[in-house]
């Protein structure tokens, strides 16, 4: 696997892991109609893509020059944030994300930020930005997000069909 585009796609797709993401989105899969669920995912993906492309473009210099922190510090802080989100899931259950929003436009932001945009995916976008020219990095980011959305919507449709049968 020497192609930098394929390696970048594999890295980003492995971090997104739509099968694991479906567990985080289970309350939305169960509670929203397919059309609303799809709209929320697309909006969340567009928010995420914008953030990832900015980090692919700015890279580590953004952390060093503008935020004045080392990139490793960001990753540690991101891990702490995920620990807190995980604890909220443990104590609140699948309704932890539902409590953060009440309408579909707010859902897109809450799907993007704690689920899609995290220290691992931001780190991956920085790596992709160093491997590829910006248009190529943007194509990989959009392609990976599009595939993730398609897989999640297909899983939602399958869930709804199985739910109707049983």
Regions found by a protein language model. Give the residues of each.
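Juxtamembrane helix-boundary/capping and inter-helix hinge elements in multi-pass membrane proteins
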Residues: 27-39, 103, 128-136, 160-165
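Membrane helix-loop-helix hairpins that form the core translocation module of multi-pass transporters
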Residues: 38-89
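Small-residue-rich segments of transmembrane alpha-helices in multi-pass membrane proteins
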Residues: 46-53, 82, 105-122
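Transmembrane alpha-helical segments of integral membrane proteins
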Residues: 22-28, 147-164
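Entry/N-cap segments of selected transmembrane alpha helices
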Residues: 40-49, 132-148
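Small-residue-enriched transmembrane helix starts and helix-helix packing motifs
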Residues: 1-15, 92-112
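Juxtamembrane transmembrane-helix termini in multi-pass membrane transport proteins
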Residues: 4-54
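Interfacial loop-to-helix junctions that mark the boundaries of transmembrane helices
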Residues: 2-10, 64-75, 130-143
């Amino acid at each position: 696997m020497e192609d930098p585009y394929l390696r970048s796609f594999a890295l980003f797709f492995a971090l997104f892991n739509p099968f694991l993401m479906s567990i985080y989105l289970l309350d939305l899969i169960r509670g929203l109609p397919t059309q609303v669920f799809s709209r929320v995912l697309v909006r969340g993906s567009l928010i995420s893509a914008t953030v990832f492309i900015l980090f692919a473009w700015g890279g580590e210099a953004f952390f060093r020059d503008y935020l004045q922190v080392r990139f490793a510090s960001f990753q540690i802080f991101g891990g702490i944030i995920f620990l807190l989100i995980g604890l909220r899931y443990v104590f609140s259950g699948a309704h932890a994300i539902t409590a953060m929003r009440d309408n579909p436009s707010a859902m897109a932001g809450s799907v993007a930020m704690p689920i899609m945009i995290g220290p691992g995916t931001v780190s991956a976008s920085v790596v992709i930005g160093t491997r590829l020219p910006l248009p190529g990095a943007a194509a990989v980011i959009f392609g990976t997000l599009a595939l993730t959305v398609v897989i999640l919507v297909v899983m939602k449709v399958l869930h709804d069909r199985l739910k109707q049968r049983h």
